[in-house]
Amino acid sequence: MCTEFNLKIDESTELLDTRIFDSYDTNELLLLSDTIKQSCFEFLFNSHIECCPYCGSVHIVKAGKNSKGTQRYKCNNCKRRFINSTNHLMHWSHLSKEQWEILFYSSLNNDYLSKTAKLVGISIVSAFYNRHKLMYVLNELINKKQLSKKIALDETYLTYQAKGFVNQNRRGISKDKIGIACAIDEDGNYVVHTADRGRPTSSTLIDIFKNTIRPGSIVISDSQRSYHQLMDALNIKWVKIPSGEKSKDGYTLEMVNHLHDRIKAFFRGKRNVMTHYLQGYLALFQYSELHTMMIGSKMFQDEFM
């Protein structure tokens, strides 16, 4: 997938990293919000072809028109044919752009599915499937941030949900739980990603964090066994908090624990979220946090609701 759509979002979020949020006035927040919203819609509803939606190659040529008169294109790399809406949010969609915008903002506001369906003017079933389509696109759009300086690393757990699976309500951390690997640095940048059922393995953690944590950083975590191989692979300083302790040499896991609270608060109003869709919900959580942080709930309601 093309990466050009992420540039404006990255530039805008860097502003949030370099200044204190309280120092922004209302006009600055609205301008920053408009920039990020415009970048999102540029990706979601873009009709200008810059690369192949299948392989990302920029070597594309026009290849006639389809039966509806829409321009077709051919990729010289993978030889596949496509139109300007292929693999985009509007592909095979029965919703108008205005309806997608309402669904987008309602999802960012973490509205219940019934409220979203009422606002968009569709059934609850349609709202469900289109919200998942939106979350899939957001997960493809979002970039992993590079974490640096002091980084708190820990995992939290949600109940595992799958079709035909009966929860046994076992005590402790078992296969009835799905792990979410979380890492957050002192600047507030964070990475959240679904891991394994039960405790995450070292190979899973390496896959998630190997290109995320910058060299020279300090990682703070508990003494879980799977972290040992991760730290060996990253080759960085590791502050290991002993089991039963809350801190070591002034280092704590307070930052990542607060992130866990925010994740669980986001899922609190959502019952029986299927694990298959969990990563999409985590992408929606990150966009929702950015949206709420910039313009606040009252400003959101005044402008959009």
Which residues does each predicted region cover?
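Residue-level recognition of single "structural anchor" positions
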Residues: 1-305
